[in-house]
Regions:
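Active-site donor-binding segments of glycosyltransferases and PAPS-dependent sulfotransferases
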Residues: 1-13
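PAPS-dependent sulfotransferases, especially Golgi type II membrane carbohydrate sulfotransferases
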Residues: 109-177
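PAPS-dependent sulfotransferase catalytic domain
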Residues: 19-113, 127-134, 138
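Membrane-anchoring alpha-helices and their flanking helix-loop junctions
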Residues: 13-19
Length: 177
């Protein structure tokens, strides 16, 4: 298939970013067994505060935690293997160690070149670039973890609670720093 066929352009790695909120309850997940999966998670409080700056948030499904956990459990139960889980905070607090660990788990050679990149837009950024990547486009490497908005307005508490239990479960499987 287009998602799990031959790797394009004779590359050794074919990275695909999938957004879990696009996976519906009726979606067939069998194709996920044909690729190596890695789950990148982030604290729901941080996600909510970021998301509401750009989009109207009406329910927890928009953030994808339930769907991410569904995919994770499907893979764990159907393959007998625990998929790799990375916490974004851990990556930002120690990018080299986290990327070395990720590469080791995925069978990819780590190089220090993975820790930096040229600033600017990329052909591979896709349709979401204008919505999410403006800050990333200014960077040349991982920025130190910084989260100053530790509060969450009360109106988001229900959505936060719905996401938190799924996040906590996924986080319990994260690759430790």
């Amino acid at each position: 298939t287009m998602l799990s066929g031959d790797i394009p352009k004779n590359k050794s790695v074919w990275y695909q970013k999938h957004m879990a909120h696009h996976i519906f309850d009726h979606s067939n997940l069998e194709w996920t067994k044909d690729v190596v999966n890695c789950f990148l998670i982030r604290n729901p409080k941080e996600v909510i505060n970021s998301y509401i700056k750009r989009f109207n948030l009406t329910n927890a499904l928009q953030l994808g935690y339930k769907q991410q956990l569904r995919i994770f459990n499907f893979l764990k139960n159907s393959t007998g293997q625990t998929p790799v889980v990375l916490n974004a905070k851990d990556v930002l607090m120690n990018p080299k160690s986290q990327l070395q660990g990720l590469c080791a788990k995925l069978g990819i050679e780590f190089t220090v070149d993975m820790l930096s990149w040229p600033s600017g837009k990329r052909d591979t950024d896709g349709v979401w670039a204008p919505h999410w990547y403006s800050e990333v486009e200014k960077t040349t490497g991982f920025q130190p973890y910084s989260y100053s908005n530790t509060t969450l307005e009360d109106k988001w508490s229900e959505i936060y609670k719905k996401c938190l239990s799924d996040y906590d479960l996924l986080n319990s499987f994260r690759m430790k720093p």
